[in-house]
Amino acid sequence: MRTPRLRALALAAALLFGLTACGGQDGDQGKQDDSGAAGADGSGRFPVTVKHALGTTVVPSEPKRVATVNWANEEVPLALGVVPVGMAKANFGDDDGDGVLPWTEKRLKELDAKTPVLFDETDGIDFEAVADTKPDVILAAYSGLTEQDYETLSQIAPVVAYPEAAWATPWRDIIRQNSKAIGLAEEGDKLIGDLEGRISKTAAKYPQLKGKTAMFMTHVSSKDVSQVGFYTTHDTRTQFFTDLGMKIPASVSGPSESTKKFVLTKSAERIDDFNDVDIITGYGDDTGELLGALKDDPLTSKLAAVKRGSIYLLPGSTPLATAANPTPLSIPYVLDDYAKALAEAADKVK
């Protein structure tokens, strides 16, 4: 049930959204130059202006209280030594059920910090819980914010959304957007360089990955393999293959060119279209039922990758399940395990 304060926030956002739409404005929160200018706080880093898909956001001064919503945005400030006052509760890959992923717990311990307030986003963003943390800025560079979400959150604090499309922000841009918003753009660039170096070393450790084509399968159930879903080139999981030296097959890149969707589906009757795929990965289960279903089905069993066994399904109940969707703190934690599993699949490709 909505409280009066939450209803007021939503009403204010709706009114603002309506005025913006009628006026034909772009939703900008300020007019400062994109490079920012020396601020009154003397840091020389503020105000900061961040452009994104839902408008332009101005952070006027150094934020003392940083909140994050949706997946992994908290990892950028944490990696840079800033502890958020609130962040989204982990709803995937959380092995101990405390709502915090292990690499986040590790970083909080390194910073000698308590766990921030956890926002339960089971039914969407908890606007009132976010407001209760009294943030100076809200980070959402990797998110699925709607325009209404954005307008409502903007009544609480300046909001930094995704640069182009919902749930499609590459890990480098997650860092760039979020670090700029908290005045740590240079530190963010250094973090990117450090992670790129780590990824390069890992890729060199598994040379059998180089040049292999890979597809990330999704939305496939062990009870029904009649439809094969896959992430397009707009999704970070597919993009990460190229970081590891792999290639995107034409069966994935071709259909991706004519859509902005991050997931597409094909009938298993067209399974031969995917015979240019060397390695298939995806989300599995701890029982192995999905892999068994793919092998037993008269259509999917014809797929070359299924025949030779060059498939790796991420275990859904463990933190490793998140490895394919790279984030600043998860990369050092699970990268080697993920690359090793992909390399074992690559060894089966002749």
Predicted features and spans:
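Extracytoplasmic low-complexity, Pro/Thr/Ser/Ala/Gly-rich segments
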Residues: 30-83, 90-96, 339-350
